[in-house]
Amino acid sequence: MNRRNLLKASMALAAYGSVSASGLFAARALAAAADGEIEHFDFAELQAHAKKLASKGYVSNKQVLPPVLANMTPQQFNAIRYDPNHSLWKDVHGQLDVHFFHVGMGFKTPVRMYSVDPQSKQAREVHFRHDLFNYENSGIDKNLVKGDLGFAGFKLFKAPEIAINDVVSFLGASYFRAVDSNKQYGLSARGLAIDSYAKRQEEFPDFTKFWFETPDKNATRFVVYALLDSPSATGAYRFDIDCQAGQVVMEIDAHVNARTDIQQLGISPMTSMFSCGTHERRMCDTIHPQIHDSDRLSMWRGNGEWICRPLNNPAKPQFSAFSDTDPKGFGLVQSDHEFSSYQDTVVWYSRRPSLWVEPITAWGEGEVSLLELPTTGETMDNIVVFWTPKTPVKAGDSMNYGYKLFWSPLPPVSTPLAQVHATRSGMGGFLEGWAPGEHYPTTWARRFAVDFNGGGLDRLPEGTGIEPIVTVTHGKVQDFNILVLPDIKGYRVTFDWVPDSDSVEPVEMRMFIRTGDRTLSETWLYQYFPPAPDKRKYP
């Protein structure tokens, strides 16, 4: 799962039947880069084609690249630049445009690109050719690059920064990303996840073809269609992409067909990285206080409950499932955008976007699945989140999921109650204000501090009694304290977890705060990994 080495299988499928060339001049005027024969395109036909494809055996079309491309470095790959004079909508002179990625390095699968006239529904393929790219600074001899190699992916631009800063990128398997107002890429989404945490090896479906509706000159939204293929599934996707001033909003219509029985189907998957944060310091022996693309999983359950689950970098793979019916939304959040929290001047974790999923069709019963993997470096994605339907997926099944993706600094919706501001963890068994030095506590314990703010906490009458409601799956909790935090206009709840056995199984913790019968906050969930019994001691 190295974000920089996405080496997945892909497939190029037969094109739709050709039509007459009567619309050739109009099609060329709309997309000068498109040079293929005119074909008919319709989303309903794409759905039918994907369903029919699922009834046939899978055939991989991964190609063997010329050595000059297969062996090039990441620096060489990035140095091959798409020529903006051949952008897909250069002749439209509008607000939107598309550039393509060259194949090479780990991106070996040909992805086919098409330009579509939305009025006539005529489509033409954009074939790979040398004049679409600038090789000058790459050290690559383009004369050694032969044949129609297809493309690796594409990126989208919007005025006023056309050909300067891209706002959306699709590259590798079914991965895609977008930026927000901070103009910094972070976590990724995927078209589909299959068996991410199952007995058999994880499968990475590929987007094998894309169709781009040519926009009007004043249009501000991209419309892109995609064909997905893999050994276990096919899919037809429609992306309506609105690149707004402060966020990117994608409305996705996904039609998925099972080619085989699927043990674990992941809908609207997202992939991120969490190395260390305020509560997890195991891998933070650097100058950086925190290193992560996302710090929490946020969920708005179908029953209205809001949940905050801080992410972990565990010592071994951990899988958590949160049952729900018709979820209102969920996502991976980068809640802290202060430079001082990261001290990073290279990849700018303080500028990373959050990603929120909002279902727009009924998703029924299922679970939000969270996979956390150990990572030793920030280039390895180790967090995966997706929706898994409760009903087992059998060969021949077809499913439709509609949803929106919001790429923004923070999710577009939030609870009216108090939210978790931060989670911290450290040595327990002593009074706050005391620091280890002359002596240590005699009993080992682990302390947790959870800060809440918002939701009117700063407007509670003086003397209001606040009660933390805490449950744990094993061990016991004690030594509660509730502290006012004026700097965040909220409260801090601290407590100690004390083991009652030698078990090293993860402790599932759950907490919210209330006053009387009134709930004041969202629900905090946390997974703690106790040390081995012989490590439960102080110096």
Swiss-Prot record:
GO terms for biological process: beta-glucan biosynthetic process. Pathway: Glycan metabolism; osmoregulated periplasmic glucan (OPG) biosynthesis. One of its GO terms (cellular component) is outer membrane-bounded periplasmic space. The keyword Cytoplasm does not apply. Predicted to be exported by the Tat system. The position of the signal peptide cleavage has not been experimentally proven. It comes from the Bacteria. Residues 1-29 form the signal peptide. Belongs to the OpgD/OpgG family. HAMAP family: MdoD_OpgD. This is Glucans biosynthesis protein D. The lineage of its organism: Bacteria, Pseudomonadati, Pseudomonadota, Gammaproteobacteria, Pseudomonadales.
